[in-house]
Swiss-Prot record:
<keyword id="KW-0963">Cytoplasm</keyword>
<keyword id="KW-0472">Membrane</keyword>
<comment type="similarity">
    <text>Belongs to the nudE family.</text>
</comment>
<dbReference type="GO" id="GO:0030659">
    <property type="term" value="C:cytoplasmic vesicle membrane"/>
</dbReference>
<keyword id="KW-0995">Kinetochore</keyword>
<dbReference type="Pfam" id="PF04880">
    <property type="entry name" value="NUDE_C"/>
</dbReference>
<feature type="region of interest" description="Disordered">
    <location>
        <begin position="182"/>
        <end position="203"/>
    </location>
</feature>
<keyword id="KW-0597">Phosphoprotein</keyword>
<protein>
    <recommendedName>
        <fullName>Nuclear distribution protein nudE homolog 1</fullName>
    </recommendedName>
</protein>
<comment type="subunit">
    <text>Self-associates. Interacts with PAFAH1B1.</text>
</comment>
<dbReference type="GO" id="GO:0031616">
    <property type="term" value="C:spindle pole centrosome"/>
</dbReference>
<dbReference type="GO" id="GO:0047496">
    <property type="term" value="P:vesicle transport along microtubule"/>
</dbReference>
<feature type="region of interest" description="Interaction with PAFAH1B1">
    <location>
        <begin position="89"/>
        <end position="157"/>
    </location>
</feature>
<dbReference type="GO" id="GO:0007020">
    <property type="term" value="P:microtubule nucleation"/>
</dbReference>
<dbReference type="GO" id="GO:0005874">
    <property type="term" value="C:microtubule"/>
</dbReference>
<dbReference type="GO" id="GO:0007059">
    <property type="term" value="P:chromosome segregation"/>
</dbReference>
<dbReference type="GO" id="GO:0008017">
    <property type="term" value="F:microtubule binding"/>
</dbReference>
Amino acid sequence: MEDSEEHHFSSVEEETRYWKELAMKYKQCAENIQEELCEFQEGSREYEAELETQLQQTESRNRDLLSENNRLRIELESVKEKFEMQHSEWYRQVSALEDDLAQTKAIKDQLQKYIRELEQANDDLERAKRAAIMSLEDFEQRLNQAIERNAFLESELDEKENLLESVQRLKDEARDLRQELAVQQKQEKPKTPMRTSLETERTDTAVQASLSLPSTPSLHRAPNINIPTPATFRRGFEDSYCATPLTPAARISALNIMGDLLRKVGALESKLASCRNFVYDQSPDRTTVSMYMNRDALETRMSPHQPLCDTGLVKRLEFGTRPSSTPGPMSHPSQSVVKMLL
């Protein structure tokens, strides 16, 4: 309309031609559009079919994915449950292991403390062992000393028994001599007058001087050793044997003393005959000497410190056998003989 209004045709034919050309143009355009529409519809149908196939595929795939998703969700739930169970189990195990670790640490501390105590106790036991070893060695040393002392004492006891036998033999001889003297005193009568007071005093002085023997070295004594001796021994003789083991020098000295005493006893026995001549041939002298000898012997028996050998010698002088019939010697040699015997 606008074109018609804008265009001013000069004739009707021109206007008809114009409108024919315009109709042909629009018709050609409509045909083109119709062709395009057909092509579009055909492409749309193809595309729709393709989309439907894709939709079906997508739906089937979606269904598969949903089923897979459900399956995976179920598996996830089961895995979660398993994980929870394993987590709780692991937590319990970790808690138990922590408790065990704490207990192990406590036990380790206790064991370390116990080890220290054992080491201290071991040190104490080692010290006690060393002390026991030292005390045992000391005890063994003392035991060996005691064994040696006992062996020495046994030898001394053997010597003492021998001396006791000798003393008993001398006592038996003295008893026999005493009995013989008693018989002789009953049978004999006085043959010479009594001594004067001066001679008696001189004889007393000689006998008293003869009783004091030269001192000999005493035996080595040590305390705390007691040996039982018979009741017949004097205290001095007991003290000489009641001692600890003697040193070699003291033992030799003691043996020398005993040997000297035994030699003196033998010498006294050999010289007894010469004394008997004076004692029994001169009756007044015999009576006086016997009186003083009896008194000295009694004092010797009463004295606790007088050695046993002196008592035996006095008894041998006091009780003698009957002398042989020989001429009587003078008074002065007899006094020297008494001194030698004593």
